[in-house]
């Protein structure tokens, strides 16, 4: 026996079931995507935070039977900048308590309150602006309870569709593999050993977040799929 949650959004349209839009996120029906941070006539604005959550909570681990879920998620986004060298602040995939609400914008990416506090969240960040706690350039990072990434890898920005796959397995390895549509052989990877049950409650919600600060860019989400499996019997 197992407890499974799975979904596959190949596009986003108004009134899509099982999604919770938070902050500034809206649906763009003509482009069949989610516009994560606010735009005025297609131009991104400062100090915006937007998020989308999957409505059904995920059973991440079970204390009684001492089991942890494994999962895989994939999504495609497009970060557009008029000037490729100037913008902010990025997109994250995150797992958080089921009552999670948007936090601070800018470099906090809608999932952290500030630089000091411990947040009940695990995230993969696609960070497009180097804050004081960040490496020097745009990067992909794995964050466990803190805005300061546990591990990062450099990531060059292009105005192109970017596809990400994140897996978490029974060996407690969280790994990220990602590429631009026009350069599919150029793969950005990062992985870390993460014990999710030490960082998160047994039930979580999953989502994607984005934020702008003083600098801006478009953050648009075009597809998102997910599957988690929690073994329920103690034999497996």
Swiss-Prot record:
A UniProt-annotated Pfam family: Lectin_legB
Residues that carry a glycan: 118
Sorted UniProt keywords: Glycoprotein, Lectin, Mannose-binding
PROSITE patterns attached to this UniProt entry: LECTIN_LEGUME_ALPHA (PS00308), LECTIN_LEGUME_BETA (PS00307)
Single GO MF annotation: D-mannose binding
Lineage: superkingdom: Eukaryota
Function: D-mannose and D-glucose specific lectin.
Record note on quaternary structure: Homodimer of noncovalently associated chains.
Family designation: Belongs to the leguminous lectin family.
Protein name, per record: Lectin
Organism of derivation: Onobrychis viciifolia (Common sainfoin)
């Amino acid at each position: 026996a197992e407890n499974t949650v799975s979904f596959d959004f190949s596009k986003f349209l108004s009134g899509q079931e099982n999604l919770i839009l938070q902050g500034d996120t809206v649906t763009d029906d003509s482009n069949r995507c989610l516009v994560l941070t606010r735009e005025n006539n297609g131009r991104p604005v400062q100090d915006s935070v937007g998020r989308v959550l999957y409505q059904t909570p995920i059973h991440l681990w079970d204390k009684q039977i001492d089991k942890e879920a494994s999962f895989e998620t994939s999504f495609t986004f497009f970060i557009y900048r008029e000037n490729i060298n100037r913008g902010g602040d990025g997109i994250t995939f995150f797992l958080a308590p089921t009552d999670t609400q948007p936090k601070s914008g800018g470099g906090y990416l809608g999932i952290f309150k500030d630089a000091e506090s411990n947040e009940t969240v695990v995230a993969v960040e696609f960070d497009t602006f180097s804050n004081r706690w960040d490496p020097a350039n745009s990067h992909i990072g794995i964050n466990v309870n803190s805005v300061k990434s546990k591990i990062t890898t450099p990531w060059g920005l292009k105005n192109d569709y970017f596809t990400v796959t994140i897996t978490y397995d029974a060996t407690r390895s969280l790994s990220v593999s990602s590429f631009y549509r026009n350069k599919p052989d150029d793969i950005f990877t990062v992985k870390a050993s993460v014990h999710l049950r030490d960082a998160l409650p047994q039930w979580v919600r999953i989502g994607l977040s984005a934020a702008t600060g003083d600098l801006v860019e478009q953050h648009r989400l075009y597809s998102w799929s997910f599957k988690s499996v929690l073994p329920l019997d103690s034999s497996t």
